[in-house]
Structures are given as structure tokens and as C-alpha cells.
Amino acid sequence: MEQTSEILDSTAALAGVGGDRIFLSELLGIFRAASSTLLDDIRKALVKGDLPAVGNAAHLVKVTAQNVAARRVYAAATLLEEMATCGELEGAREASSRLVEEMDYLKPPLTALVNAVGRSRC
């Protein structure tokens, strides 16, 4: 399971939970479930021009991405949160597009990590 990349650092993810593969598996499940809902919340808030809601959802994506060491998603969510906090609607739209792209890039390594953790839960 040793894999380090700019997209997903599986070594850091495992170290972040003290080597507890079961807990990491739970965190990965939470991240997968929450991220699609949060991206939908961001999309809806952008349509309404509700930057505080965009910022709140981006913050939650950032925190969950940090918990699983999804580095590029974390960076994209951080940028989106900053744009929303600064009242930059157009910048938030652009940052949201980047976040969606990064989530798409994350899917293969995230699936691989979920499978690796699931195979070696002891």
C-alpha cells in the first residue's frame, strides 16, 4: 500500500491515523460519501450566488481531504474557500471547476487505496 503522490499520499493517510487501517477505511468511506454531496452543495450555492454557503462547503471538503491526504483536492478546496471568503464569485466559479477536476483525478488512486486498505485490515 506504500504510495506517495501529489494526488493522494497513502503513506501520509495511514500515518495520520496511527497506522489504523480500519479507521482509515472508515475515513475514506466518509470522504467518498461526503464529497459528492458537498460538491453538489457548492454547485447549487454558486448558482444562487451564495458565497458563504460555498465557503462553508469548500471548508468541509478541505478538512476531509486533509484527513485522507488528498493533496490536490485539499489545495483546490482551499482556493475555493478563499475565493468565497473574499467575495469573488467569478473566482469561486473557476476554483469550483478546478475542484471538480481534482476530484475526478482523485477517483482512481482513491479507489486503489480503498481496495488496498480493505484487503489488509489487520
Task: Identify what each model region corresponds to.
Residues 1-122:
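Two-component system phosphorelay core
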